[in-house]
């Protein structure tokens, strides 16, 4: 009996260690692919080295992360398609002013739509996977661990933290655009010059807010990279 129990314990230990190995390998592959947001992630979540509940848990977690990454990257592709990175291009705005801002109106509408869609998809993924936990043929303790893990993942999700800042930037951009449409301005030396000092101050304040928000995003990104590099060295 002692020998049988010892063998079972050793098998469980070996399976646990293999689970860690597989998850580390797969997460590294996922991270590498996720950096290229121009195309969907295509990660094989299955691995023959795992069996039983280790296989189920691995595939469950990897599928959750893949769907989150793909939702985020699709959102980034939609921002690029909307030419969001050219919003404050002075030449573009000056040209668009002559067209009653048709391009900028569409740009902001497209970005708002993409943001709403991503927010909805993000919440849907989380709810779907919380429900899927109950379908896994694992013990009650493992289900509770997965529920806690998904809850902690959502709270610590740095991509979503960045998204919440991006929403603030969009709000600021809409305020800036309102000023551009409402008050006369002209282009001078690649700058936007309003005729009245009050509008200059308001526009500049909004622009400074955007710069600060972008700096926050960069800080989070650098922190993420440092944390991941630390994990890979361990």
PLM region spans:
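Residue-identity detector for glutamine
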Residues: 5, 9-11, 17, 29, ...
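Generic cytosolic/nucleocytoplasmic N-terminal low-complexity/intrinsically disordered segments
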Residues: 25-27, 131, 222
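Amphipathic alpha-helix face/heptad-repeat signature
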Residues: 57-60, 64, 107, 111-114, ...
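Extracytoplasmic/luminal low-complexity segments enriched in Pro/Gly and acidic/polar residues
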Residues: 168, 172-234
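Leu/Val/Ala/Ile-rich N-terminal alpha-helices, chiefly Sec-type signal peptides and the beginnings
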Residues: 2-104
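Exposed alpha-helical structural elements
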Residues: 18, 56, 60, 74, ...
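Extended amphipathic alpha-helical interaction segments
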Residues: 80-193
């Amino acid at each position: 009996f002692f020998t049988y129990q010892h063998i079972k314990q050793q098998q469980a230990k070996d399976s646990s260690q293999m689970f860690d190995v597989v998850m580390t390998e797969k997460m590294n592959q996922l991270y590498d692919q996720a950096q290229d947001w121009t195309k969907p992630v295509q990660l094989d979540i299955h691995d023959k080295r795992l069996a039983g509940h280790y296989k189920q848990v691995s595939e469950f977690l990897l599928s959750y992360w893949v769907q989150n990454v793909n939702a985020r990257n699709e959102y980034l592709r939609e921002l690029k398609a909307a030419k969001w990175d050219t919003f404050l291009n002075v030449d573009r705005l000056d040209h668009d002013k002559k067209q009653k801002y048709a391009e900028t109106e569409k740009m902001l509408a497209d970005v708002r739509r993409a943001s709403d869609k991503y927010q909805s998809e993000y919440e849907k993924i989380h709810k779907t996977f919380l429900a899927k936990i109950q379908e896994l043929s694992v013990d009650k303790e493992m289900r509770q661990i997965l529920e806690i893990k998904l809850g902690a993942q959502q709270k610590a999700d740095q991509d979503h933290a960045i998204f919440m800042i991006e929403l603030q930037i969009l709000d600021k951009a809409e305020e800036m655009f309102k000023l551009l449409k409402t008050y006369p301005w002209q282009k001078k030396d690649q700058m936007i010059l309003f005729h009245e000092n009050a509008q200059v101050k308001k526009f500049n304040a909004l622009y400074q807010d955007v710069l600060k928000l972008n700096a926050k995003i960069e800080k989070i990104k650098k922190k993420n990279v440092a944390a991941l590099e630390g994990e890979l060295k361990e």
